[in-house]
Amino acid sequence: VIGFRFGISYADAFGHRGFSHSLAFALLMGCAGFGVAPLFLRGSRLMGFTVGLLAVSSHILLDAMTNGGLGVAAFWPFDQTRYFCDWRPIRVSPFGLKGLLSQRGLSVMLSELRWVWAPCLAVIAAALFFGKNPMRAIPRK
């Protein structure tokens, strides 16, 4: 979306959901996480790499699950094709604040709550519950 201000078209490799939605970019962000982990995170470099890689990879997958746009350039720079998942339950978000504050925007927010945020919160809750002691849920003999 920022590219629009610089005259980069939506469908361009550097346009919306282009190179920044590729596995190559996810790997690059993993490497960035590896590099900055000792400076900003209490975790190891491996944790920094994993967080960077998974954050971008999950974003690619979620954008491929939307019902609009041109798809994601998941295999850029090797393949310029834009891809969608076969199953696309997430409503595509309108551009701009005015669009987000409309009836359609509310529908999008409810769709994202259902398909993105609720599952994320469930995973976080499970990690917090089981994280410190994975055996907690198993009764002792």
PLM region descriptions:
Residues V1-K141:
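N-terminal membrane-targeting hydrophobic helices
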